[in-house]
Amino acid sequence: MDKKAARLRRATRARKKMQELGATRLVVHRTPRHIYAQVIAANGSEVLASASTVEKAISEAIKYTGNADAATAVGKAIAERAIAKGVQNVSFDRSGFKYHGRIAALAAAARDAGLQF
């Protein structure tokens, strides 16, 4: 099993648990260059809010899009957008990535901005 397959297996296991609980998810995906976040409804078919370093407003405010500072900016933006839609309680779906570095920075920024998980 390669690295990506193992990560996807971890992600699937966590997502099934969140689906059983019927929780709104804060889903994070990262690449070496960018980081993406989406708040997905409990039914799994509707994206309530999204933010990423690809967006012009966020990428202009930061120097580089692939570091923890960029993840912090995305975490703050996703929290503000989710709260504007009336979502405060979410489950954090790290998509099988380690809770470390950019993933942890995004989570901390989202918590500081008002999301609860």
UniProtKB/Swiss-Prot annotation:
Keywords: Ribonucleoprotein, Ribosomal protein, RNA-binding, rRNA-binding. It holds the Pfam family Ribosomal_L18p. It comes from the Bacteria. GO terms for biological process: translation. InterPro entries: Ribosomal_uL18_bac-type (IPR004389), Ribosomal_uL18_bac/euk (IPR005484). One of its GO terms (cellular component) is cytosolic large ribosomal subunit. CDD domains: Ribosomal_L18_L5e. GO terms for molecular function: 5S rRNA binding; structural constituent of ribosome. PANTHER family: 39S RIBOSOMAL PROTEIN L18, MITOCHONDRIAL, LARGE RIBOSOMAL SUBUNIT PROTEIN UL18M. Belongs to the universal ribosomal protein uL18 family. Part of the 50S ribosomal subunit; part of the 5S rRNA/L5/L18/L25 subcomplex. Contacts the 5S and 23S rRNAs. HAMAP family: Ribosomal_uL18_B (MF_01337_B). This is one of the proteins that bind and probably mediate the attachment of the 5S RNA into the large ribosomal subunit, where it forms part of the central protuberance. NCBIfam families: L18_bact (TIGR00060). This is Large ribosomal subunit protein uL18. It comes from Aeromonas hydrophila subsp. hydrophila (strain ATCC 7966 / DSM 30187 / BCRC 13018 / CCUG 14551 / JCM 1027 / KCTC 2358 / NCIMB 9240 / NCTC 8049).
